[in-house]
Amino acid sequence: MRTICITGSAGGIGAATRDRLEKEGARVIGVDVRDAEVIADLATPTGRDAMVAAVTDLCRDGLDGLVAAAGIMGDQPLVVAINYFGAIATLDGLRPLLARGTDASAVAISSNSTTTTPGLPIDLVDVILAGDEAEALAATSRAPGVFAYPAAKLALARWVRRHAPQPAWIGAGIRLNAIAPGVIETPMTKNDLEFIFSIPDVFPVPIGRPGRPDEIASLLAYLLSPDAGFFCGSVVFADGGTDAAVRTDDYPTPRA
């Protein structure tokens, strides 16, 4: 039986992924602020440390898979605290358990907003990636508009790309990848769906509907499985065609 940890397991994509994996026979350790095996607030260093300690206590023999799905929208500094710093603390903190697992795989949840948000300030992304959380939260508070979410998700995707090929990850037998969902119908996004689908010239969704959490869960289950054994450092888009529609010719970009 595989043992897999999912943060954000109480709702949305995390809950759908839990359901999918448990139906496949996996033992799932859920992490959330409610209705989970491990109750933890990933917005704070103390909460992250408590999460790592609790998961370690429950998984003495190691982890075979990890999904860093905890995330929020709304308050800008809190978005960065949870969606970036909470995610990398999860990935780094549980990496020793993954190293003891079998055919281990970790997947972070990024977003297609990383490539489809006009005017996203890359300097904010760089500040987040630099790793000083206090400075990153301060910079986020000063940033215009609602750039915290895409900036945090872009920083997370780049963190995954930087770390996946390194000895600490693939060198230890751990595959690290990310996915970039588009508009998914979850409790977190329900208030935004009508607006998003009212501006097709700005934010097209060629498939014509929001995605379902179970569709993303299927992708995550695949990336966690041995069938995805050649994936390392990939950021897989599942967004109904939005990224392709707005970036038709600027991906892939040839190496300089």
Feature map (PLM): residue ranges:
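Structural signature of the Rossmann-like NAD(P)-dependent dehydrogenase/reductase core
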Residues: I6-T7, A68-A69, S105-S111, R175-A180, ...
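N-terminal Rossmann NAD(P)H-binding glycine-rich loop of SDR-like oxidoreductase domains
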Residues: T7-A10, G14-D19
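Rossmann-fold cofactor-recognition segment
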Residues: V33-A50, V55-T56
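Catalytic loop of short-chain dehydrogenase/reductase
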Residues: G71-Q76, A99-G171, V183-I184
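C-terminal helical subdomain
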Residues: A89, A148-P150, L154-A157, A178, ...
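Short, flexible catalytic-loop segment of classical short-chain dehydrogenase/reductase
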Residues: A180-N191
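Short C-terminal tail/terminal secondary-structure segment
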Residues: C232-A256
